[in-house]
């Protein structure tokens, strides 16, 4: 029996899909990427934006009509009602996001890095976000169990573990919080990198940044869920921080870990966003040493407060503002990549054929010569930059 996995959305969705895939393989299933060969499709969806939801719905409709004999299993952050499936029996939720986190002991081995899901759900009430509808209240995986799981990943040959969750800043178990977890994971094996997923600006972020700086094997990359540089818009979004808090987190990270990769999420065209608000976001991006950004035009999600707000910003304006932010970050990312010329970087090899991989700062890097094993960590001296990709010579 063959199973085909189709996954949309964030790292958390990917982590859950990889774990489910490993569980299926352990039970004797064979993975396939060819739709025509599949006996079962597992679609892990995403409804965070209308675009993601539409892409997911189109795929599900296509699979249902072209391969009616195959089973279809739908899970993840997807609005089942929006699918308009005429045969309800085709909808088989693979796991409820309101249950406890998975206790599977099967270790996924297909990817170059391991994904450690430490938390699920969210206690926030952001006016634009539909995720709590699917993932429920915040709950955290047991601290000791996570360390045991990380050891399994290390024993399986992984040299990078990505810490992921719905809202990492809410992690709490056995009187331990995210900074404690990062320190404990980093202490397991100096030869295994720890990469942190997105965190909210604020007190937890400041403590986590301090913990990151104390361990050389924690990747020098921080991604903040900023969303906007305007306090007025952040308040309307019900984000639990101000632009000042964003700046504090960024400046502390840059001070304690010079040269780190700094990313953020930014949204354009939130209801009521004026040119002045957008200018504040542009100013934040220019002023602070961000070198990566995920930029999204606002997408109305049915059932969220923001979907009913007045002051709607036209979709063309949302796109223009998103393009402006993208242009700003593109120039900053290129300058960031150029700053590594002549330096030595550590690369986790993802593609065995080309040797391409990623530095701890989340820059793509390719060797000029040599062959390398997937999942291995290789040190390279950067000799050239091509389209923000580092080219390097392996160190002897």
Name what the model sees in each region.
Residues 256, 275-276, 280-322:
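C-terminal, non-catalytic macromolecule-binding modules
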Residues 1-87:
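Cofactor-cradling patches in redox/metallo enzymes
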Residues 135-162:
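Conserved alpha-helical substructure of the radical SAM core
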Residues 111-144:
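Canonical Radical SAM [4Fe-4S] cluster-binding loop centered on the CxxxCxxC motif
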Residues 308-396:
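Terminal RNA-binding accessory module
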Residues 73, 155-276, 286:
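Conserved SAM/AdoMet-binding glycine-rich loop
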Residues 84-116, 160, 396:
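N-terminal [4Fe-4S]-dependent radical SAM core
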Residues 10, 171-190, 300-331:
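Radical SAM enzyme [4Fe-4S]-AdoMet core and its adjacent flexible, acidic
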């Amino acid at each position: 029996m063959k199973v085909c996995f189709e996954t949309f959305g964030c790292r958390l969705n990917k982590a859950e899909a990889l774990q489910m895939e490993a569980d299926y393989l352990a039970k004797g299933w064979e993975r396939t990427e060819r739709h025509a060969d599949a006996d079962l499709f597992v679609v892990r969806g995403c409804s965070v934006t209308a675009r993601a939801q539409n892409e997911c719905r189109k795929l599900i409709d296509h699979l249902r009509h072209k391969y009616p004999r195959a089973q279809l299993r739908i899970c993840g952050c997807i609005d089942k009602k929006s699918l308009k499936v005429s045969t309800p029996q085709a909808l088989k939720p693979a796991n409820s996001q309101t249950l406890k986190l998975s206790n599977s002991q099967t270790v996924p081995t297909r990817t170059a890095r391991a994904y450690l899901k430490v938390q699920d759900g969210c206690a926030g009430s952001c006016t634009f976000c539909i995720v709590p509808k699917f993932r429920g209240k915040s709950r955290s995986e047991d601290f000791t169990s996570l360390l045991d799981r990380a050891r399994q990943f290390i024993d399986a040959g992984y040299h990078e573990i990505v810490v992921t969750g719905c809202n990492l800043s809410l992690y709490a178990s056995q009187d331990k919080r995210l900074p404690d977890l990062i320190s404990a994971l980093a202490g397991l094996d100096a030869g295994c990198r720890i990469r942190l997923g997105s965190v909210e600006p604020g007190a937890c972020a400041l403590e986590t940044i301090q913990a990151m700086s104390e361990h050389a094997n924690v990747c020098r990359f921080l991604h903040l869920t900023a969303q906007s540089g305007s306090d007025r818009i952040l308040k309307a979004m019900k984000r639990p921080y101000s632009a000042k808090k964003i700046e504090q987190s960024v400046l502390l990270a840059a001070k304690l870990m010079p040269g780190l990769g700094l990313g953020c999420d930014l949204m354009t065209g939130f209801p009521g966003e004026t040119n002045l608000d957008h200018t504040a976001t542009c100013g934040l991006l220019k002023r602070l040493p961000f070198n990566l950004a995920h930029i999204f035009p606002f997408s109305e999600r049915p059932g969220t407060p923001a979907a009913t707000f007045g002051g709607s910003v036209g979709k063309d304006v949302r796109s223009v503002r998103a393009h402006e932010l993208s242009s700003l970050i593109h120039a900053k990312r290129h300058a960031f990549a150029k700053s590594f010329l002549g330096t030595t970087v550590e690369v986790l090899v993802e593609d065995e054929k080309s040797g391409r991989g990623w530095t701890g700062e989340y820059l793509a890097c390719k060797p000029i010569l040599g062959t390398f094993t997937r999942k291995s960590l290789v040190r390279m001296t950067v000799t050239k930059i091509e389209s923000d990709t580092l080219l390097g010579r392996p160190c002897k």
